[in-house]
Amino acid sequence: VSIPARIIQTARNRDLPLRAKAAAASLRCLNPDFEYLFFDDAEVDAFVQKEFPQHRHVFDAFPYRIQKYDFFRYLAVFRLGGFYFDMDVFLASGLRELLRAACVFPFEELTANRYLRRRHGMDWEIGNYAFGAAPSHPFLEAVIQNCVRAQREPAWAEVMSEGIPRLLRSEFEVLNTTGPGLLTRTLAENPELAGDVTVLFPEDVCDQREWHQFGTLGVHEMEGSWRTAGSYLRRRFCNLWEDWALRRQLEDSRRRGKTRSLRASVQAGTAPVRA
């Protein structure tokens, strides 16, 4: 089973800013034979209601719009198959070489998340700004189930906040309930699914210039429009803490070398890891 030639994107409405239009144009121009599907908010609501009525109450219960968008992208690709892209992802070449895969996600960055590092021995995360999968792929099914669990069982998701100052935990809620943190945790806790997932690792995972890309095919511009509103000082403190926490972990990551393997990481995560 392979990924169908389909691109899925979503935004609040079709009145897109110029940068988003340019990003979408890069996808379509480089993949002219791919089906292109765009969903605005009303169409997202209609899709969830029609295709996943059993999850409608979960979708509605997420407090942040970005959580709804995250949940929708997993549902849409699970049902339809194809590639999802955020509106700030630009491609440099076409996607055809990835159609042979069953499920593909980008390496996002090295992580300072204590739960992933200590419980599973993983010092990196995958991203959800761009990914592809065949319809009904079991990894996406597991991701959807964990999104539901994170919404219904806050204590289950809360363990991902280990080591984060309580004042800042709301800033990381999205990441750990529907975003990259949840994705990576799902991968780490389901090693039987890892063999069917392709991760687009850079040549050097410790080189921050190679983070937030879609392999060698594209780049995520990291607009971060989903970030919760708050005071400048709060956002600044959050960014400073995140940078400090990551710097503390980079030395350990550099000792591991510049390359990573999904199989090796997941296998390592099945063994006890020292704190």
List where the protein language model places each region.
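Glycosyltransferase-associated regions of secretory-pathway enzymes
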Residues: 1-69, 85-275
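Small-residue hinge/turn detector
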Residues: 70-82
